[in-house]
C-alpha cells in the first residue's frame, strides 16, 4: 500500500473525531462537493457486517514506519454508543450540495453523528417516493456479494484484510469486528465532452472503532455478477499521535490504480485536493439551515435531463435580447425546467398517470421556463404584468399573457395541475392560497427570492434566523395552513436563493374543504394585524373546490382558460352558501406596476450626469498626481492620474440639491460613478480616475474570441479623456477603444433577432 497524503489538523478543539466523520459523510453522500466532475452519489443500501479471521496470514504493511494510535471513531466516546447499524428496507439516495456550508451541515452533534455512522439514511421526505427507483439492489444479492468477499479475504487475500483493518506488520486483525457497510453508486456528470457516463458501484466499509473508511470498487464478471475489484481501492483514516490529529489517504496496490479523471481521479488529487477539503470540513462547526440539493428527485435522471435541455436550448444565449445576463438566466431556467420535468415524471409514475401535467407560471418574467416546459410536451402558459422583448421570439406554441394578477375569485385555475412561482415576488405567498382554492388536485412549486408578505414587504420577526431562512419558513407555514404537505429542496442553479418549496399533496380529505378554507381566511386576515375591511370588502371564507375524483388534467388550451366562477356557484348552490365577495381576498394588495421604474441613474438627464462626472473628475485631478508610463509605441508619456478619494469625501464636495437628486436613485452617487466606468473606478468605497493603459494590457491577455468581441465594440462612443482631460487621452488613437473625435465614431453593432422554433 502507499500513503498518498497526510495532513495534520490545526486547532481541532473538541470537534474531533466527530468532525472527521461529518467530513467523511460529505464525501460519501455528496462527493460532487469536492469532485466537480461528479453529479452526485446514490446510497443504495446500508448494513452491519463483520470481517472474518484470516486462515493464513502473510506479512502486512502499514501506512508508514511510525506507530500510530488510532483515533476513536463514532463508537468510542465521540457519538457515544447507540444501536448498531441495520440494513435498509429500501434503497436510499445520497443527495447533492453545491455549497460547503450546506454540505457540512450534517452530523455535527454527537447524537446526529451516531446516526450518520450507524443507522440508515433518512427518507427522501415524501411518502412512496424512495421505493422503486433506478438502481434497486436485491437483499439476497447483497448477502451473496458480501459473503463471497468475506470468504476471499479469509482464504487468501490477507493483504487486503490487513488494509481494511489497518493492522500493522505481523499483527492479526480482530475477529468478527462489527463494521458499517454501504453500497453506493457514484454518478458522473453527463456531458458531451466526457465519454464516461456510466455510474460506478462500490462498497464502502466504515470501521468506526478504528477510524477508517475504505472504498472498494465493484465490477461485473462474465456472468453478470458483481465482485470486488482489486484495483482503485483506497482508504481515508484518522489517527492520533502525541496529542495531534492526522488524516491520511492510502491506496491499496498503487500499481493497479487506473485513473479515469472522473470517478477515479489521480492519486495526487486524492492526497492533495480531497485531503485538504476533508481536513477543512473536519474542524468547521457549521450547521446548515437548508436541505441537501435535489433531495426530492433522482439525481441520475436529473443529470441526464439537464444536459439534454442544456444542449437543446444553448442557442438561446446567443440571441438573448434582454439586458440581463444570458448565461445566468438561460441555464438557471434550464435547470429549473429539468427539475420540474423529473418531478412530474416521477409523480406520473407514482400516481399511474399518462397525461402530462398542465401548469400556469405566475409572474413568468422572460417566459423561458414556460417555453421549455411547453416545448417538452406540458400544456401551460405564463402570466406576467409586463411583456418582455423575448416573448416575440418564442413562437405561437408558447402561451404568454400580459396581465396583472390580483388574488381573488377571478384568478383561480381549477383545471390546472401545477402553479409555478419562479421568483414571483409579491405573488409568492399567495401561490399556495391560489393553488388550494383552485381545486383539490392543484399543486404548487415556488422558488422564493424577494421577501413579500400578503401585503407589502415581509417584516422579520426572529433575529436568530437569517432573513432568507425565516421567509422560507413563512411560505412553508402558508402552505401548511392552506392544507398542503410542503416539501423543501435545494436546486442546482447559479443563484444564492435556490431553495424551492413543493406542495404535492393535501393534509385533509376533500370533504373538509370548507372548514380548511375558513382557516385559510383567518390566517390571511391575521397576518401583520390586517385592519377590518370596509363594507363590501369583507374577507369571507371562499369554499371553492373541485371534487377529488375529477381528472385534474388539462384537456387542451380551452380547459386552461376556464375560470372557477361556475364551480363556485355550483358549490354554493349545493351547500346553501351565500354569494361570495367579488373583491380581493385581502384589501390593500397591489400588483407591481406595468411600467418598471428605472432607478439606476440611467433615467437622469444627460446634462446632469455629464455635469456631475466633470465635477468629480476635476476634484480628483486637483491632486495633480502625475504618473509616467510607457505608451504602446515605447515612448514615455506623463499623464495626470489624479488622486483617490472616498465616496464620503466626494459627496461632501457636491451641493445639497445634487445629492438629493441622486439619493432618489438606487445606489445614488456610487451608482452614477460606476455607470461612468469609462472615467472612474470605484474600488472598496474609493473613487479613482481610470487608467486605460492598464485596461489595454488586460485586453491583450484575453482569448482571441473575447478580443474580437471587444474590438467590435470599439469607437462607438467618444473618448471622455480626449475631450476633457487636461493631458488628453493616455492612449494613442490606434489603441484607445473610444473615438478621438466625431470623425472616428462608428455605428454600434446590432444583433438581428431570430425566431425560436
Swiss-Prot record:
Compositional bias (Gly residues): 72-84
Disulfide-bonded cysteines: none
Primary localization class, coarse: cytoplasm
Residue ranges of the region described as Disordered: 55-93, 108-138
A Pfam family hit: AdoMet_MTase
Keywords associated with the record: Cytoplasm, Metal-binding, Methyltransferase, Phosphoprotein, S-adenosyl-L-methionine, Transferase, tRNA processing, Zinc, Zinc-finger
Any single GO BP term: tRNA methylation
Enzyme Commission number(s) of this protein: 2.1.1.211
Gene Ontology CC terms, in alphabetical order: cytoplasm
Family: Belongs to the TRM44 family.
Name the record gives this protein: Probable tRNA (uracil-O(2)-)-methyltransferase
Organism per entry: Homo sapiens
